[in-house]
Structures are given as C-alpha cells and as structure tokens.
Amino acid sequence: FLKTTALPAMRELGEELSDKYSLSVNIQTHFDREEPAVEFTIHKESLRDFMYGIKTIKREVSEQLIKDGHLPHIRHNVTYEPYTYFFDGRSGYDVQYMDRRELIADILKQYERYLNLLTDVGQELMSHQQTELAE
C-alpha cells in the first residue's frame, strides 16, 4: 500500500502544490523501520510544518478467523494495516481502503484543518494583544 498507493498519491499532490502554488513540499520514505512509513511535509516559514504520515501497524489475527472456512483469504496470524499520523500528535486512522484520489483528498482535508488551526491561533493572539493594548 505504501509503495503502490500512498507514495504515488503524495508525489502527485506534491508536484501540483509545488508547481501551481510554490509550496515547499518534501516526501520522505522510511521503509527500513520496524513500522515502515511515508511522510508528506509542507514547510512553513517560522511556523510548525504540516506533516501527514502513513505507517504500517502490525496486528494479530484471531486463530478463529484463520480457521474459518468462510474466510479462505485469511491465512496468516499477523496482518499489516496502514494508519495515518500527524504533525500535532493526533491519533490516526486506517486508510487501507482508500485509493490514490481519496488519499489526496484526505491529505488536502488535513492540510485545510492545519491552516484553519493556524488562522484560529493567529486570531486568538491578535485579540489577546489588542486587549493588552486597550488596558
């Protein structure tokens, strides 16, 4: 999933954001880790960078599922699932059923959330400074 779906989606989005919007985008691969991962980062001057990562999480499969004759595709006692992780430490979610386009949309949705957080924090700081000036 990381090599066939996530990485191509990140590369496609990264090229578009760099070419059309002159954003500084970096994509890193960490296939040599215990939990292989890919990371999509947009660098922001003097602010925390936006980072959207996907790593594979190892999960145990129940012995009952392996022995179930109605589930012949389950043959191993371990499975690996792609989960997101973010710049702010929030818990991620399973993205194994997303295709390339859905993954691009998800990255953009999280980037929009990041921009909204920056806007909210900026407005809060500005209103706090104006209150101090008024005093």
Where are these regions (language model features)?
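Contiguous, amphipathic alpha-helical segments that mediate oligomerization or scaffolding
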Residues: 1-24
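Sparse, context-dependent recognition of short Cys/His-centered cofactor- or disulfide-binding micro-motifs
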Residues: 10, 25, 88, 92
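Charge-dense, helix-prone N-terminal extensions
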Residues: 27-30
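Intrinsic disorder/low-complexity polar-acidic segments
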Residues: 35-135
